[in-house]
């Protein structure tokens, strides 16, 4: 199995199996890419067309993944990872899919993963969206954390889930970028992916969103410098799984969220 020469801008190096997967995929070595997964792996990918929050296309098992990749065929893309965090067998990352010929970003992607005991990929849940700009390294180039990002995220989620919209928006810097998957109601953020620039825009968007009877629950998180990656699930008020999401947050020098990007799918993909 060949390893990848893929570079990671921020955070941790990719696990060997994930680096090999991207390297093989980018090199159109599709059987080699499938070999990076465990026998019973869950491979959940965004649809080729439609809305980015649409249900994932789920394939189970290395053999079926190999068949799927063979049908997929070669693509003119390369993966560039802008932020990666790994803790034990769990991880999450954000990156860009770039055009192999021009080097220009074509889309942003995010993923969560769980590794098997032998280091192969046991669960891979991916998301894609239009390019989210700026990248984490541009939002805050410092390597020093001004606060504990997960605490600020919890503060934000609790306020949002309790419909305290000004308190939720106060967790963000005045010049924040907030990039969110398409809302069901286009009155909140328009059609397609929603981006709000600045706290005032974000506060107004939270009010348009209104009260929703859901609960955000974080199942993995890790911070590197001022940058955080997390995986979460959304439950309804009865505790049933509705959706899965990955979010990236970058703090400013005052410990407020200067950049927040999230990716979501419904229904959720259970963890192992």
Residue ranges of model-derived segments:
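Short N-terminal micro-motifs specific to bacterial/archaeal maturation
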Residues: 8, 24, 55-56, 112, ...
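A solvent-exposed, acidic/Ser-Thr-rich amphipathic alpha-helical stretch
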Residues: 11, 30-89, 171-224
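Short, low-complexity N-terminal intrinsically disordered segments enriched in polar/charged residues
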Residues: 1-35, 39, 131-170, 174
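A beta-strand edge to alpha-helix "cap/lid" segment located at domain peripheries
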Residues: 2-9, 66-148, 203-272
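A structural signal for well-ordered alpha-helical scaffolds and beta->alpha junctions
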Residues: 18, 62-65, 153, 165, ...
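Disordered low-complexity repeat/linker domains
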Residues: 29-30, 49, 121, 164-165, ...
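Aromatic side chains
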Residues: 21-22, 37, 43, 109, ...
């Amino acid at each position: 199995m060949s390893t990848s020469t893929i570079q990671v801008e921020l955070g941790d190096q990719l696990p060997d199996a994930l680096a090999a997967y991207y390297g093989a995929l980018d090199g159109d070595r599709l059987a080699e890419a499938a070999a990076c997964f465990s026998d019973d792996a869950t491979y959940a990918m965004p649809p080729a067309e439609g809305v980015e929050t649409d249900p994932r296309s789920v394939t189970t098992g290395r053999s079926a993944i190999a068949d799927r990749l063979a049908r997929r065929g070669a693509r003119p893309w390369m993966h560039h990872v802008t932020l990666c965090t790994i803790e034990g067998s769990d991880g999450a990352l954000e990156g860009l899919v770039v055009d192999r010929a021009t080097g220009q970003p074509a889309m942003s992607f995010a993923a969560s993963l769980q590794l098997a005991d032998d280091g192969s990929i046991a669960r891979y849940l991916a998301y894609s969206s239009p390019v989210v700009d700026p990248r984490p390294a541009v939002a805050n180039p410092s390597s020093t954390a001004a606060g504990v990002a997960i605490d600020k995220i919890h503060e934000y989620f609790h306020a949002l889930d309790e419909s305290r919209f000004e308190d939720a928006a106060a967790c963000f810097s005045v010049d924040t970028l907030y990039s969110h998957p398409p809302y069901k109601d286009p009155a909140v953020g328009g059609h397609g992916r929603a981006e709000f620039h600045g706290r005032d825009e974000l506060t107004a968007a939270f009010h348009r969103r209104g009260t929703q009877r859901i609960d955000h629950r974080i199942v993995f998180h890790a911070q590197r410098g001022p940058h955080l990656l997390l995986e979460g699930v959304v439950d309804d008020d009865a505790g049933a799984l509705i959706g899965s999401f990955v979010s990236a947050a970058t703090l400013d020098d005052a410990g407020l969220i200067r950049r927040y990007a999230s990716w979501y799918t419904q229904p959720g993909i259970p963890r192992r």
